[in-house]
Amino acid sequence: MQAIIKEFQLGQHTVTLETGAIARQADGAVLASIGDTSVLVTVVGKREAQPGQDFFPLTVNYQERMYAAGRIPGGFLKREGRPNDGETLIARLIDRPIRPLFPSGFVNEVQVIATVVSVNPEIQPDMVALIGTSAALAISGIPFSGPIGATRVGYIDGEYVLNPTLKELEESKLDLVVAGTDNAVLMVESEADVLAEDIMLGAVVYGHEQAQAIITAIKEFKAEAGKPTWDWTAPAKNVSLEEKVASIAADKVGEAYRITDKVARKEALGVAKDEVVAVLTSELAEGESLDKQEIGKIFGSLEKKIVRGRIAAGEKRIDGREPDMIRALDVMTGVLPRTHGSAIFTRGETQALVTATLGTERDSQLIDDLTGTHKNHFMLNYNFPPFCVGETGFVGSPKRREIGHGNLAKRGIAAVMPTLTEFPYSIRVVSEITESNGSSSMASVCGTSLALMNAGVPIKASVAGIAMGLVKEDDKFVVLSDILGDEDHLGDMDFKVAGTAGGITALQMDIKIEGITQEIMQIALKQAKAARLHILEVMDKAISAPSEELSQFAPRIYTMKIPQKKIAEVIGKGGATIRQLTEETGTTIEIGDDGTIKIAATDGESAANAISRIEQLTAELEVGTIYEGKVVRIVDFGAFVNILPGKDGLVHISQISTERVNNVTDHLSEGQEVKVKVLEVDRQGRVRLSIKEAMESAAPAADAPTDA
């Protein structure tokens, strides 16, 4: 069993690719490693396509094994279950740059499985998985126009940093992933701390340049370990049928694409397609049948040719707009009375209903992954129900696309969010897409910014998002602002940019063709900035600053600090004291290890009551001070008196009266209120009290000290 190993340097790290020792029955299997982070990537393809298959069934699975970090999974089963959101996002990150590189017409099933088997917490496994996938596909023999290289780029102290560690990313103003071939960028995914367009473009170019070392190494690895390429040829085009379909439907498709309303346009295209089927069916000889899937594919190609040709020739777009025009905008805030914050953002035929909900730290999301357990205080969920595109469909748990779009919107907003210290709330945003015709994720960014401001969340600035498209025919190209769903489907690029008036906060790019130059990206960024500023201007007319008051239905959070040694007194035995406090005051109380207490209440009176009770619980008794107390228990040698919540002291029989006391019950009864003087608090916290000295003392009774 002879393993083939390839090592190469990538920035500060050494990358190792190994094949031939593990998973030898897969078409391609590579153990990719950077430092102690290792990912096993396998690729298997079916030699024969399913009969009637009309799409490319590529599946990418990314899975993190807890043993990779020396941990045992939680839960009853103690094993990994369905992919979490993080795993789903990385699976999409791998899928996006490799999918365009399979040849047109290739519809054989291909499955990529990336399994994290060892992890160094400082080296993220996503880049290792991407590099491993590229290498595994390259050596598999499956038709693939790779390899690709992928890098992560940070921006620290004005310098680009290649593949920064997790610690370096904490200081970085940028987290950008770029993937591409030796001569083209295919995919960009990023989050930024309000950076200028030229810095973002520079990061893309830098990352692509650095990825060349990966591509070169994988080519050398393939030369040594690669399997013969499959003997596959693309199915021959049915030219005569294409010409026949065009002769029947070209004019009607052209007319349909001059209809600006999406629903009406869809109906017109349906009529044209039905006519094609009817005409061709009438011309069939006896015993012949019509391949409706093939007809549908040819009809789709005709649509694409007509729309792209018009745009490239300088004609107006499908809905009558110029290339840089934005659809009509409509913005409303505070639309739902009981939510903490809400907004409806409408751009043409795309609409998002967005809500913001405030909660306590206890409401934050607990994430258990390879790096350990940590809390997520800002959650953004994106829902794309079938009715938003006028269809019926399955409604249930979120699909990969919904998870990805929600994450993109969240990354676009993250840079302007307050810290937990500045605003001690957990925040959940939900974007319900109620209409969709292109760029619903960017509508979610705009709606989120509006809903957060409506909720009174002190975000640093308004954020807007825009989706750009591209039509490139030979040397001609047109960059489109605010693309429709059809333009996304028929175009060559999906380029999404979110940001404030001051710069970019998120950038996502997916390119379907090679040849996207730096010039094209520069024009797209410039056009996107103009569009973003226009949208921000409209949004600011609706709401330009966070509401000064929170919703009356939102919890108010008050913060106080107690000495760490007093934490146990507030919690009580088995949590009894804090449970009693929350029940009696109607508040939610959270205590940090450093003694910070957060009290959440829907009204100020409840919070003030809870604060007062906690101050009493944590107050230090002062020797010589007189307190008002209540007798709670009588014993033969005296009585126990409660002087502060949770604090009892003993009045010895000799300290009850100036007269001789033979029987305690002759002078005191349970529930009786008395004034007592603190004589002593010993090392164990036991308190000696005196009624006699309180009566003799001339000092006035003191209220409970509020030393907290």
Curated annotation (Swiss-Prot):
Q: Iron as a keyword?
A: no
Record localization: Cytoplasm
Supply the name of the protein.
Polyribonucleotide nucleotidyltransferase
Which Gene3D superfamilies does this one have?
GHMP Kinase, N-terminal domain, K Homology domain, type 1, Nucleic acid-binding proteins
What keyword terms does UniProt attach to this protein? Cytoplasm, Magnesium, Metal-binding, Nucleotidyltransferase, RNA-binding, Transferase
Q: Which residues form the S1 motif domain?
A: 624-692
What is the recorded function of this protein according to its Swiss-Prot or TrEMBL entry? Involved in mRNA degradation. Catalyzes the phosphorolysis of single-stranded polyribonucleotides processively in the 3'- to 5'-direction.
